[in-house]
Each structure stands twice: as C-alpha cells, then as structure tokens.
Amino acid sequence: EVFVTCEPTDGEIGRLIRRILHKEIPATPQTVAHLYAADRTEHLYQGPDSVTARLEAGDLVITDRYLFSSLAYQSVECGFDFVYRLNEPFPLPRQLFYLDIDPDLSDKRLSGRGVRDMYERLSFQKQVQAFYERTLEHFAGSGVEIHRLDGSVPAEELTRRILASLRL
C-alpha cells in the first residue's frame, strides 16, 4: 500500500505551525524549528498511521516535506548547525526528490494564489534555495538517493518522473 503524508502534519502541533506560518500567532524562529521537530517526532512515531508503523507494515511512504525542508527553511533564521542538531536523530529516507525551481519563477506562481505564508517572500526563498543546496551537499554520500528534478516543468511531468524513479 502507498501512504501519502505531509509536514507540517494535520496533528495539533502541525496545526499550530500552520497558524504561525499564516501569522495568526507570533513565535520566534527557534520555537518554530522546535515545533517542526516535535511535529516530526509525532509524525514518525505516534500511532498506527505513523510513518514508522506504516513502514513496518510494508507500506511505501511518500511525504511532502521532511527534515531536509527544515534544514533549508529554519536554517535561514536559526543557522544550519542548530537545525541540524534538532533533526539529526530522525531516520533518513531511501529517496529524496528535490524540486529545483528558480525562486523568481516560484514567486510568480505564488502571486496567483492570494494569501502567502511568512516564508513565501522572494528574498527569503532565495536564502532557502541556498540552504537546500547546502543540505543536498551535506547528505551526498549518506545513502539517500537524491533526485534533483526541474521544478519548472508541468506537474504531470514531475509526477511521471517521480513515479518512474519509485519503480512501482
């Protein structure tokens, strides 16, 4: 069975993160980094639909965002080493699909969406892209099969490429 999930999750901590992202409640960058790590802990280990439970059942787990996203996003304001230490205990996936897209194009796509979250600013996204590069370099040779995909291609083409790489 294929189990598709995301971070932040729909759990209590994930919902709190979403409220912070939408600027409904204030939080320091360090608090946000800790909340992502806490949400990830629940996501991985809590309950019958946790990532580890699904993996133990033999399911294929696909998650939209994981510790690599934390390293890219939270490192902008907290520093890479701080965020890495928070996320170091988490297991690495077999595969990572990184959708590489120019921040200017991403910003253009976001402009049609209306309300943006606190990270969806062009200047911030350019810094995030630099930390994604650092993160990918850091995990090269770690055993994670890293797939860098052109994020400017249509979603259908990206889906086709990802499914081909998963060898379902």
Give the positions of each predicted feature.
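Hydrophobic anchor at the start of a short beta-strand
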Residues: 1-2, 61, 94, 146
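ATP-dependent small-molecule kinase phosphotransfer cores
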Residues: 2-84
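Short beta->alpha linker loops
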Residues: 8, 12, 39, 66, ...
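A glycine- and Lys/Arg-enriched "phosphate-lid" helix/loop adjacent to the NTP-binding pocket
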Residues: 65, 69-131
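NTP-dependent small-molecule kinase module
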Residues: 104-168
